[in-house]
Structures are given as C-alpha cells and as structure tokens.
Amino acid sequence: MRSTIASRDFAAIAARVRKIGALNRASLPAVLVMACAFAACSGQEGPSAQLPAPPESTVQAPVDGDWWKQSGDPVLVDLITRGIAADHDLACRGARLANQAEADASADRRLSGRMRKLVGTDQGLSRAASLRADQYAYAQARAARAAAVALAYVEVRRLQKVLVLRTERLDQFRDNAAIAEFRRQAGLVTAIDGGIGSSMAGVADADLAATRARFDRARSELARMTDMDDAALLTALGETGDVPDLGRDPPGPADQGPLHRADLLALRYRLLARIEHEKMTQADIDKAEATRGDPSTPPLLRDGLGELDKAEADARAEIGATRQALVTLDAREPALSQSGERSRRAVQDARSAYRAGMGDFATLYVAEASALSVEEARL
C-alpha cells in the first residue's frame, strides 16, 4: 500500500508514524530514491492498517523516481548521474542518513532501548519522524542538484545549436558578399552592395565569436558540475546541439489536490518530530488545525502550521507560473514554426532574385537576418 502523506492532517500522520514504528529504517535507500520524485514515498504498512487511503496525485512519477532516466537522452542521464556523484556535500548527507538509520535500528534492538519503550521514556517516534524529515530533505537536495545539472546541460545545448546556426549563416553571408563583389566588378551594381555584404559577414563573424565564448563558458561550468574533462564532455555532446523530445504532455487544468513534494513532506515530518518530542496531545493538534493563527495556540503548532501554509502557497505559485509558461510556449510554438517556414522561403526567393539580377542586396540582407532571428527564437 502506498504510504503517501497527502495532507496536513497531523492526526493521520501521527497515527501512521506510530503504526510504522521505526518507519522501516532498513528501507532507507529506497526511501531516498523514491522521495526524490516529489511524489509518493513507499513505506511498509502494518497488517492491521485501518487508515483511509490518502488521495492519489494526478501526476504519476517514474517508478524509480528519477525523471531524467525517462528522458530518452543518454547524455543527460549520464551527466546528471555524474553531477549527483560529484556533489560531495550530498554524498556526505546520504552517508550520515544511512549511518543514523543503522544506529537507530541498532539502539532499538538493544535491551535498554526496549526497556525505554516499556516505561514510556523512549523518544523513538520523534527520532523516526526526524529521520524521515532528513530523508525527504536529502531527496529535495538531490532533486535540486539534478535540476541544476539539467538546466546547465540545456543551456549548453541551446548555445551549441545557436553556434551551429550562426556558423551556417556566416558561410551564407560570406557567399553573398562574394557574389556582391563579383557583380560590382562586372559593373552590374555599385560598391554599396559589396560594402553591405562585407558588413554582414563582419557582424556575423563577431556574433559567432561571442556565441562561441558563451558556449565555452557554459560548457566549462557543466564540466565542473559533473567533474568531467572538457575534451570528454565535448566528445559526449557531439556537434549538432540536438536534444531528444522529452515527450512532455500539454498542461492540463490546475491540480488542487495535495502536493506530493519532498520539500513539503520534510517540513511536515519535521513538525511531527517536534510534536512527538513535546508530547503534545491530539486535542492540541486538532485545536491548532481548527483555529489557525490563534495567539493562544502553542507557538510550536502555530508557527509550524504557518510555515507549512506559506511553503505550500509558494509551491502552488511556482507550479502556477510554470504551468502558465508552458501554456504560453504551446501557443507560441506553432506561430514560430510558421514564421520560420515563411522566412526560409523569403531567403530562397531573395537569394534567387539577387543572383538573377532582379533584386537588391538590402532585401537579401533583411531576409537573411530575419530568418536567423526566427530560428534562434525557436530555441
């Protein structure tokens, strides 16, 4: 049974933690991986579970929790794997969590631990909730690292593609300039065409050099993040700059259900650990839930619930902004595609007309520059 913590119902959370007991500490590696999906965390329920099933998320995460493994881009998968492994702070946090889980499990097995449980002085539930919070915080940090590497990779690919486009366009500009000079020498046009052609090639050459410098800087940063040699990274990237289609579904209606995010789950378990440590009653929790912001509410509950509310509101605002950006992108893409097709036809017509002596160089210049702008805008 999926043990997703789906709401701020602390009664259900506390009951679930008490039922799980030690939160299945032996399953730490699975928890660390699954929680990273910002979705459900698979736990082990007791045989007498009577809690109602939590609401299901409308967004299903990959089975193993690592979204990049479903991207269809082996270069991205390799770079994120390297980037996570190269983050020494993240590795240390994972090792500490594994050691803490083993230490807690060992303490529970000792006679003194069992005696503390019998006499009611054990803080095992508080420690268990705190450990689970640390696990989700680790998962959040791991996911953030993966996202940072992915964004750096996409920027490198974008600049690589721009570099390819501008290199191709520079070759065309130089060809146009050569044709203009030939026609000037033949007395067919004035020197203005040759001057414009040389200026076009010079500007394109400068833009290409600036793009190459930005590409080198972005690639250097990606190599640093993934602990790779620059030559090895260049080999892995290849020459085209193409990125496989990730198969993103179009954004649907906003999901107002519970947010299955590791950062929010970490906050909830952190608060639960403090509640258990302070031995607060279920009545305290219910009252705080019913009278949010009441000055008479214990500060621990009042501030903790306020922090959760703010974190969830911020998360929903972030999701809403991302959703709107995707909607805008979906509306923009067809228009850019049509503009790109029109601009390519315009370039072909202007080039043919100029070579046939039926068009002017200024028209060709504008057509070439417009086509390049549209192609780069699509990136």
Locations of regions flagged by a protein language model:
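Terminal intrinsically disordered/low-complexity segments used for targeting and assembly
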Residues: 2, 6, 13, 28-30, ...
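N-terminal polybasic/positive-inside topogenic patches
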Residues: 14-20, 26
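Short flexible linkers and secondary-structure junctions
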Residues: 42-155
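Charged, alpha-helical scaffolding/interaction elements associated with membrane systems
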Residues: 86-87, 186, 356
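Amphipathic alpha-helical coiled-coil segments
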Residues: 92-107, 141, 148-164, 218, ...
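Short, charged, amphipathic alpha-helical segments
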Residues: 94, 121-128, 191-199, 361-369
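Periplasmic alpha-helical coiled-coil/stalk elements that build and connect Gram-negative outer-membrane
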Residues: 102, 120, 135-258
